[in-house]
Amino acid sequence: MDEKSNDRIRVMEIVSRSQYNDEVIDQVDMSDLDLSFSDLSFSDLSEVMARRIMAKRVVLRASSLMRAAFHDCDFELADFRSCNLEEINMADCRFGEADFSKANMKYAKINISSCFETRFDEADFSHGELVGTILNHATFRHANLSGIDAEQADCTGTDFSGANLTNSKFEKAHLENVNLSAVDARNANFTEADFTGAILLNGDFTEADFTGAKLDNVVWTGANVEGAKFDENVKEQVLKII
């Protein structure tokens, strides 16, 4: 049996014991188990609870982590592609350059975390939470973010092109230089958000709320703002450049 297989067995023993005893996995240094390069694809990690674990570059592709909970963990460069992360709760974690493409993230929470250059392309993150999370230069291309709560999130340079943002909440979010091309953002709440330099090309912002938002140097070409709310006299200026 090779070393990677041994690492997988040892990790799954820890996980199974945690699941069976309903215990929190606390401060496990996964680097000692060489988990940084382990492949845990297709594993069942549902309802696991863990804090302060190191899991850089771990491969969890197509695994189930439904209703799992992670606090103060490091998942930089981790592979979560096509995972079932429904109702997962993650806080104060690091996901730099991790990949959540095509993951099921309905009702998932990634709050007060760091997701620098993280990929969420085509993920279903509907009704989830990204409150206070850093998402600089992350990508959500064609993702479903309907009903997401991203209040005070830092999305500077983030790519949401083609995403579903209907009924989403981005109050006081940093959206500088964000790409919102061709998004469906009907009824979205952008109150007091900073859109400086953002691209809203061909987006649907029907009934969206931009009250108090900073809108300097925004590209509005082709955008639909029918019924959208703006500060006094702002909508007239926007309509002139669409």
Predicted regions and their residues:
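Tandem repeat scaffolds
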Residues: 2-242
